[in-house]
Swiss-Prot record:
This is Atypical chemokine receptor 1. It comes from the Eukaryota. Its main location: other. GO terms for biological process: chemokine-mediated signaling pathway; inflammatory response; regulation of chemokine production. The gene is ACKR1.
Amino acid sequence: MGNCLHRAELSPSTENSSQLDFEDVWNSSYGVNDSFPDGDYDANLEAAAPCHSCNLLDDSALPFFILTSVLGILASSTVLFMLFRPLFRWQLCPGWPVLAQLAVGSALFSIVVPILAPGLGSTRSSALCSLGYCVWYGSAFAQALLLGCHASLGHRLGAGQVPGLTLGLTVGIWGVAALLTLPVTLASGASGGLCTLIYSTELKALQATHTVACLAIFVLLPLGLFGAKGLKKALGMGPGPWMSILWAWFIFWWPHGVVLGLDFLVRSKLLLLSTCLARQALDLLLNLAEALAILHCVATPLLLALFCHQATRTLLPSLPLPEGWSSHLDTLGSKS
């Protein structure tokens, strides 16, 4: 948000010369004893002073980025191993191919977190930053769309239920996610050694498109799922979308979509913040929402593990075992 994002540092010589010039003009124009009260003088200086905000995710936040990345990679890798482990009960989890893609998306996000982290040097290129933002938002968009499909289609996503459905959804969802990342990929780069979104008049259309995409995927999609669930239940039209613990994923990205929309309105001057405190509060919310979104790469594998544990414990007694599982259990029974 303008100078609320980046504080302009003045050299001592510049500060001294500015102070001397101001004092000379003030004294020569009005004299030492002025008719204005001290309160008005201080208020005028405060109003004319630039509004500065402290960035929470600066170089001091590097340990947070690194720790989150490492934990996210380890947790996602563990979940993927359990999902693809032969003859393991998580493969009976409804829609497990979609769940595996969620873990892949979380792992991809965890990998690019250090690329966008501040404090790792000042030699990063714009191409690397654009690639980082592409994977960052692409994996998040794909995870949100996968959750929507998993909630809407439910048990029909199981292996062998509808031939080609899982493959078609995989290609379609990741393709749509890649298209949605084009605006942020083109509107991002390196500035002062940091990966950042570039705000300019020429890129305003790309910024608006990216903001709309975030609002649609992170805000409107979960609201639509909740609305459809409540409407179908109220009208007695069926169970509606399959509600599960996985819906907690949107808690990590919903604030990011909302605050990003507010920030775009302020930058476009469609929403005016008259006080410095309000602008500082918005900057703080942007940092907190980004930090919460980053934490999703650690929370997603935990949500997947909890969902698979609950689903297999509930559905395992009633599900028909695949042929390989039956022979495996028979072998174990004969040995005992």
